[in-house]
A protein has these predicted regions:
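TRNA-binding/sensing appendages of the translation machinery
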Residues: 1-65, 76, 122, 127-167, ...
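Conserved oxyanion/phosphate-binding beta-strand-loop segments in alpha/beta enzyme cores
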Residues: 1, 24-25, 31, 53, ...
Length: 285
């Protein structure tokens, strides 16, 4: 119908209904309660969470006929919290989990690969509420196991669960299930000697390079027609891993500059930078 927007019909609808039934069965096994949130939400809920301003153009914003600011739901954390405020005012109602299967809209900058990256899509999202961190962590493991069963039941057993970046959703712990394919666009790290698995955006490592040599005296050197760190290292006849480069970013909020010093053979992980700064920045070279 449009870029990133598709209609579905038989036999796709039959397949989708079967997958949705599997999702419901597995969510019900871990005591999930199915709900239905509104697609359109008042902007005030998103103002309260701070995401009305922090999320970019992916969030579709509009004004209704009464000049009230509204958003078209791309996720429903705010709506879930609003529901819990009204429903679960007593600690005796905790813990509990609510989930829904709903059409959502995210204004992707580059919709591509058919149904893989679209703007309008169906998503099963779930939200759980607990009285302690320990209870939350235990339930997180139940959810993780439920998703493993889901992938097994739908016939996609070759997925890999990896540590991931929580992105706009926030949180300290996040995993995503990655389907290994040569046409994929994400990279993951798998350790051969342990169970560590992570998306490159969230992966952590310890440098295996140690520099025992003493630093030479500081000296100003003329480097004509040398523009990159590779050019500089070639000019001095050394490897880029033995150098340090500065990368400058401009913060969008107040136009302040952030200078990052990183080993010459590495690149800045901009996802980690955004998480550290709490906002998006633009690179200035």
């Amino acid at each position: 119908m449009a870029n990133g927007i598709y209609s579905s019909y038989l036999p796709l609808r039959r397949i989708v209904r079967k997958i949705e039934q599997i999702l419901r069965e597995e969510m019900d096994k871990i005591d999930g309660q199915e709900v239905q949130f509104p697609v359109v939400m008042p902007a005030s809920l998103w103002d309260e969470s701070g995401r009305y301003d922090s999320i970019g153009d992916e969030l579709l914003r509009f004004t209704d006929r009464n000049n009230a600011k509204m958003v078209l739901g791309m996720t429903h954390e705010e709506a879930a919290v609003h529901l819990v405020r009204e429903y679960a005012q007593s600690y005796t109602k905790y813990p509990f989990m609510i989930y829904q299967i709903q059409t959502k809209f995210r204004d992707e900058a580059r919709p591509r690969a058919g149904l893989i990256r679209v703007r309008e899509f169906t998503m099963k999202d779930a939200y759980s509420f607990h009285t302690s961190q320990e209870d939350l962590e235990q339930y997180y493991e139940k959810c993780h196991a439920a998703y493993e069963r889901i992938f097994e039941r739908v016939g996609v057993p070759e997925v890999v669960s990896v540590k991931s970046d929580s992105g706009m959703m926030g949180g300290n712990i996040s995993h995503e299930f990655m389907l290994l394919t040569p046409v994929g666009e994400d990279s993951i790290v798998l350790c051969d000697s342990c169970d560590y698995r992570a998306n490159m955006e969230a992966a952590e490592n310890i440098s295996d390079i140690a520099r025992d040599a003493e630093s030479a005296a500081l000296e100003k050197v003329y480097t004509p027609n040398v523009h990159t760190i590779e050019d500089v290292c070639n000019f001095f006849g050394d490897e880029t891993k033995n150098s340090c480069k500065a990368v400058v970013y401009q913060q969008n909020v107040d136009d302040k500059y952030v200078v990052l010093f990183i080993r010459g053979d590495l690149e800045v992980n901009e996802t980690k930078l955004v998480n550290f700064l709490g906002e998006r920045s633009e690179e200035r070279r």
